[in-house]
Amino acid sequence: MVEDQYPFKFKWKEAGLVNTPVNNNMKQGKLRYSEAFYSVQGEGKFVGVPSVFLRTFGCNFRCMNFGLDRGEKMRDEKQKEGIIHNQEVQGLLDKNIHKTTNRFEDLPIIHTGCDTYASIYPEFKHFNMLRTIDEVVEHLISLLPEGKWTMDNGQDVHLIMTGGEPLLAWQRLYIDLFEHPKMKDLKNVTFETNTTQMLHNNFKDYLTNQDRFEVTWSCSPKLSVSGEPWETAIKPQVALDYADVDGSDMYLKFVVADRVDIDEAGRAVAEYRKAGIECPVYLMPLGGRSEEYNLNVQEVANICMERGWRFTPRLHISLFGNAWGT
């Protein structure tokens, strides 16, 4: 079984990946993803860089408390087949939105919990695509302005592996993805990860030995504001595993709403530093909606200046609002 061969406890059945079944998907070289789109990177080190985003399906977290007032927790949670749903997601399910909506991009945007809920909850699995690596690559290439990763003017388009959590078992397919003939001019890959998933040995060896593209780990450990427990969210040994990939770059990025979150981020950074992780630290304001984001942005920027940490905006929120495909 796939889950027995990985050092994490992702609940495949709850994520809707067993009934696919994921084992057969892997054998057939098929990747399930919710969307692929071309935009500018809105967060972190490469803000403003033209990028193609590949959002894989499935996550080991739910982050149900994002967007709630401090001290408030998701109430009246309903359980269905062992799955705890965010209240807003449950409301959509009660209204049969997942059955009456025809297109992924027409699904409503929610304001609490994970804003990419359609990439993690199994009821929305049918909105996601299950494609061979050849088909995935064709989709990605079709999004590029010149049909190639390095443009005629010498500028390159980055590939962002995001989710969900892109470093679940799908990582087994990434060698074939990156070695595809139409990916040979790819120069930069960023993994946007919650930093809880160890790398598969073969994939780690591949990343260490290849010298064709730069690898960046955008590590965004979840704080208590997300609703995820510290002991499952803060994993310095996983960050060390990523840092062990020769030539790769890394930064920590924390989503924060106020000084309480920022103090907690400081404690988390101390844990990573103690483990030997020395990398830049970014703070990003919480806020999937422009109104919420604008309330937090100046305070977070001021605190970054106080503490010497780096500030990252959510550029895509300012440019496009919180919408699928941005």
Stretches found by the model and what they are:
Residues G44-V47, C63-L68, W324:
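Short, glycine/acidic-enriched capping/hinge loops at junctions between secondary-structure elements
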Residues G29, P50-V52, I110, V215, ...:
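A generic secondary-structure signal marking the coil-to-beta-strand transition
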Residues D4-N19, N24-K27, L31, N65-F213:
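Conserved Radical SAM active-site core
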Residues E35-F37, Q41-S51:
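S-adenosyl-L-methionine
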Residues V137, I141-H158, P166-T326:
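Conserved AdoMet/S-adenosylmethionine-binding subsite of the radical SAM
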Residues R32-E35, V52-R55, M161:
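Short, hydrophobic/glycine-enriched beta-strand segments
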Residues V47-V52, T56-F61:
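Conserved N-terminal beta1-alpha1 strand-loop-helix module at the mouth
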